Amino acid sequence: MRPAALLLLPSLLALLVHGLSLEAPTEGEGQAPGLEEMDGELTAAPTPEQPEPGVHFVTTAPTLKLLNHHPLLEEFLQEGQEKDELRPDPPTASPLPRLANQDSRPVFTSPTPVMVAAPTQPQSREGPWSLESEPPALRITVALPPGPGMAVPTPGPGERPNTPPPSGAWTPTPEGPGDIGRPWAPGVMSQTTGLGMEGTVATSTASGDDEETTSTSTIITTAVTTVQPPGPCSWNFSGPEGSLDSPTASNSPPDVGLDCFYYISVYPGYGVEIKVQNISLREGETVTVEGLGGPDPLPLANQSFLLRGQVIRSPTHQAALRFQSLPPPAGPGTFHFHYQAYLLSCHFPRRPAYGAVTVTSLHPGGSARFRCATGYQLKGARLLTCLNATQPFWDSQEPVCIAACGGVIRNATTGRIVSPGFPGNYSNNLTCHWLLEAPEGQRLHLHFEKVSLAEDDDRLIIRNGDNVEAPPVYDSYEVEYLPIEGLLSSSRHFFVELSTDSSGVAAGMALRYEAFQQGHCYEPFVKYGNFSSSAPSYPVGTTVEFSCDPGYTLEQGSIIIECVDPHDPQWNETEPACRAVCSGETTDSAGVVLSPNWPEPYGRGQDCIWGVHVEEDKRIMLDVRVLRIGTGDVLTFYDGDDLTARVLGQYSGPRGHFKLFTSMADVTIQFQSDPGASVLGYQQGFVIHFFEVPRNDTCPELPEIPNGWKSPSQPELVHGTVVTYQCYPGYQVVGSSVLMCQWDLTWSEDLPSCQRVTSCLDPGDVEHSRRLISSPKFPVGATVQYICDQGFVLTGSALLTCHDRQASSPKWSDRTPKCLLEQLKPCHGLSAPENGARSPEKRLHPAGATVHFSCAPGYVLKGQASIKCVPGHPSHWSDPPPICRAASLDGFYSGRSLDVAKVPAASSTLDAAHLAAAIFLPLVAMALLVGGVYLYFCRLQGNSPLQLPRTRPRPYDRITVESAFDNPTYETGSLSFAGDERI
């Protein structure tokens, strides 16, 4: 067999094994060990080809003994329950298409076959991640970087590889480098690539030509040798938390930059949270973070947004980080990230119209319960449960509340019944019956909120009884106008019947009912308004006062009504009605302007004008929240008090939310509807909120602050004005004390405040010292003690105490001390010894200085040759000063034998004069001694033996024995002369 065939043999074997694994998967493939069967169905992820029957949901999630389980969003849930209407989060895709009622959710599929490695125990930096029940591994496919054995183009020297890694599939296993992160290896992530291997095999097997086979083998060999495997620079993490560290320079191939991948996979139902603990990149290096688990990677962040302390969250349980560095020696940079798993949650469910929702938890296992208002029925599941998955989701779609066609309402106290589809149009061929039954001993009252029937055979009948045979008290066939005062039942029942034919539709009807006791008036009602009463049960004598919501006006009734007639209690006036009228004037500082008859459709051919007026030094902000008018209708805003003022804006047709600001204290609003336009539907018109605001050429007026005052730089708060806030003694400014009016007419900072000072300011450190503090925040009573370093002296008080002062802020008991270099007194200069010298010749010597002493020739130094000025208070010499004594014969003969002096070096050779002095000086001394004795005896006897002439004797001192010279000439060692300090 040729060498080329030998090279081709491993490739053929690998392809054969791969093909077998794809065609005939082994038993249990794609199913993790420990995967159990529930309700006759496996918990493995389904495929897109499988249908979506309403089967029992089975999940791979364990019971909710979860790691890193954060507290539930209690505050968020409470806030959401208090709101009337909540916006749902945007729907997120689920990777489990077989779960019940997931009709509209996209399906995440694997683009390539996956070979699942056997799972092992997951590891992390913190130790093993263990659960009570081992979770099965899910099959997940994402893009994989090139690995060993994959042929990719090799960048040239200095060229940076910036192409994305080839598409592939990888399977994160529970085993991973959660503790330190281990390099990627083919055993961890199986992949298939489009390398053209199949074509190569076909060519080599189909042809018997050896030359062709050799050529093919050469091509394959060349492709493999050009690979720059990034194996040491790719890691797979599967623990619940860990660290991502930048690779070292040793990981970088020669002349090629690094292209590193960090793959993170946590347990489904958790997301990946990455925190930037440190990052320092070189110019040209990139770091990208993506969320995985969907059909396409989700970009989360790159090096432009990665700052220290930043937190990035992936909405799925997989994430990837890619680091690309420059070739050596420029790179690589450094970074240190920490990741951890966090519990994912379902989105907040949408509140149904005419209903409410109550949520226990948004995390897996939580539930949402729905209910509808009276007169509406729930269509859909009443209870939803949050299921654990790659992205948690509700087990069903949110229900809706629809108006029921008929029904029995027993113990009816207060509520409403509406026609099917209300406030929209009802459908054809309806026959609906409602039976209202009040509690025992009470009667019913009906208010007509709205009745709109088609002008044909559609009919509304209200009967004073409990069946279709009861006498009618209202029949739409016979009554043209609705009774403003409503209807009263003679017993505890009302029977309502609505029938429609096969042609024509309308909005239908809305009736409000109230039950009331005998001897009392019924509860009044005003649509789009409120009322206050003097008694909650409305007995005789009760008074009620009505008011309308902003934008509405009271009509057709009295503002105050009273319950009268004890025998047959009733209101002395009918309840008023609140309607949105065409035109009006207002001087309120805030309010609402509504289209005529809102929320009902406005009429055709209307021309309405509203005027809004505020104080002269104020301006008006118009907040147009709803604008749904016909294309032939016109809404115009004038910046003034009449139609000749400047036009702020003119609009036709529907438009989104926007705002307008006036330059005057007045605004005029004109609405003109098209006479020939068709009738619009419900909630067609406009809603405009207006507010009084400060002048729009100045910043808003700043208020005074307690315990302080403000000082503006000029009276008018125009652009550039500076306002300075100061506090009274004993208080300090919290926040910025200087605010500036900016170009956008807003203040540069938030309003500060004055806070009572209860602590002293930090006195600070003292140079060349250390301090001991009793409390780090320096409250009243705290102490600070300063201790100087060695060689320094404290000047001032060493102990400071924080004292409270009623009239001002707390203050330290003394000023901060100082540590000065210790100044020591010098030593006084010593006189040179007699027959000797000292060096240096100074009058004063600083502490630490040294003085050297020496003797003249023929004298010996007794004492220390060098003494030092010892620092102190006061400074003193280390030893007494030495003296120079003359040499003596005793010293010369002190030795038991004469030691011949060693000849010194050539530099210290004795000259002849010194040698003569050393010999004759003792002789002279002896002669003087003999002469002295002689003269003594001669004087004692009165005459001289030598008969010398008498002369006046000269005085002389008595020579004592101490005057004898010691002779050091023959001492062992060198001879001692002036300047030699040794004896």
UniProtKB/Swiss-Prot annotation:
InterPro entries: CUB_dom, SEZ6_CSMD_C4BPB_Regulators, Sperma_CUB_dom_sf, Sushi/SCR/CCP_sf, Sushi_SCR_CCP_dom. Coiled coil: none annotated. Residues 1-19 form the signal peptide. It comes from the Eukaryota. Pfam families: CUB, Sushi. The keyword Coiled coil does not apply. Residues 101-112 have a biased composition (Polar residues). One of its GO terms (cellular component) is neuronal cell body. CDD domains: CCP, CUB. It is found in: Cell membrane. Gene3D superfamilies: Complement Module, domain 1, Spermadhesin, CUB domain. Residues 344-403, 519-580, 697-756, 758-821, 825-886 form the Sushi domain. Keywords: Cell membrane, Disulfide bond, Glycoprotein, Membrane, Repeat, Signal, Sushi, Transmembrane, Transmembrane helix. Its main location: membrane. The chain crosses the membrane at residues 915-935. Belongs to the SEZ6 family. This is Seizure protein 6 homolog. It comes from Bos taurus.
